[in-house]
Amino acid sequence: MKILHTADWHLGQTFYEYDRREEHLHFLEWLKQQIRQHEIDVLLIAGDVFASPNPSAESQRMYYRFLREVTSENPSLQIIIIAGNHDSAARLEAPNPLLEDMNVTVRGVVRRNAEGDIDLQHLIVPLYTEGEVTAYCLAVPYLRQGDYPSAENYSKGVQLLYEQLFNEVKEKGLPVIAMGHLQATGSEISEDDRSERTVIGGLECVSPDAFDEAIAYTALGHLHRSQRVSHRENVRYSGTPMPMSFAERNNASGVVMITISAEGTGIERLAFEPLAGVMSIPRQARPLEEVLQAIGDLPDGDVTLRSPYLEIKILMTEPEPSYKYKIEEALKGKAVRLARIAAMLPQKKASGIVATSYEELQTIRPLDMALDVFKRKYGGTEMPDTMKQLLESVIKEAGV
């Protein structure tokens, strides 16, 4: 059985007012080619199909057209989709009666039975080969409060749900695949990336121990960097098909191919080249004169759909009312698309001066800020655990 793992498409994303439709179409065409070329049996999409809970009509057309075309071209292909935190779980599930006829299964809502217990069977999807069940998929969507068994905290509740699901199928003697849209302990996010910082103070980090060692592969979504989790080869984030922010400019794009056979589980990454990249100049914020020199080094040419998006970081050491005009003039004739000018003010530190923008300040977690203030106020003393736990609960309740 051959499986492809992808996630975090964010269809409909607007990148600093630039429409990314052509970039997403480029990825979906490539994905269809990989499915044909490698004769894929199962496609796993681990959440955040859309960039918003209320996607545009065009984004939905793109999504459903892809599902129709790829299942028509590959009649035996089975597709499993889970909702992410950016998706509307109910909206994603709504077309299930139609999608099931195309061999597409969507899981967004965690159902409960008449007794109030979680309907575990709804989250267990059989995988077929030539009409016979040859594996099981634990299709767990993004979990909100109340979506998991009662436990002391979010992490324990999520772990308990995966344990219950695995216990339902482990005696059947068939390979088990798990899916999830979450932040796993030991995973890495892109530096200064606001798009991924949805977990406050580690409160919703899930231990990789939630995924039993006997599970053949765990397909995760939510974090945008392709990676293994805690050095476990078979617990992975596929990453996004293209950078979703400038902080992700160095992330590798692609999907993960998993081959399950009698010999075991084989894992291979299939690299994808996005239609357009993103770039930041200079590497660190510099005064205007140096910024203009860096712009002069950019390649000349016409702006096309393959032209990279450009972020310019300028250090404002003194008032410069016309800096935007000067930058825009310098960019004329350059084969780039200006997306953002980040004007940064110098901030003094013991080690010198660093630049801080408003966007960078937004990446600081409230808990980290409080811990730092406490430490400086009380002569380097760490905040007591009881106070830290109380603060964590207040932050989580406030939802900031």
How would you name each of these model-derived features?
Residues 1-68, 72-76, 178, 393, ...:
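N-terminal active-site segment of His-dependent metallophosphoesterases
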Residues 6-7, 43-47, 78-85, 105-110, ...:
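Active-site neighborhood of phospho(di)ester-bond hydrolases with catalytic His/Asp-centered motifs
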Residues 8, 28, 48, 63, ...:
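Divalent metal-coordination and catalytic microenvironments
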Residues 16, 49-66, 83-102, 108, ...:
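Metal-dependent catalytic neighborhoods of phosphoester/phosphodiester hydrolases
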Residues 40-58, 74-90, 183-203:
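Active-site neighborhood of divalent metal-dependent phosphoester/pyrophosphate hydrolases
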Residues 100-201:
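Conserved catalytic scaffold of divalent metal-dependent phosphoesterases
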Residues 184-262:
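Conserved beta-sheet core of the metallophosphoesterase superfamily
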Residues 260-400:
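Accessory, non-catalytic peripheral segments of nucleic-acid enzymes
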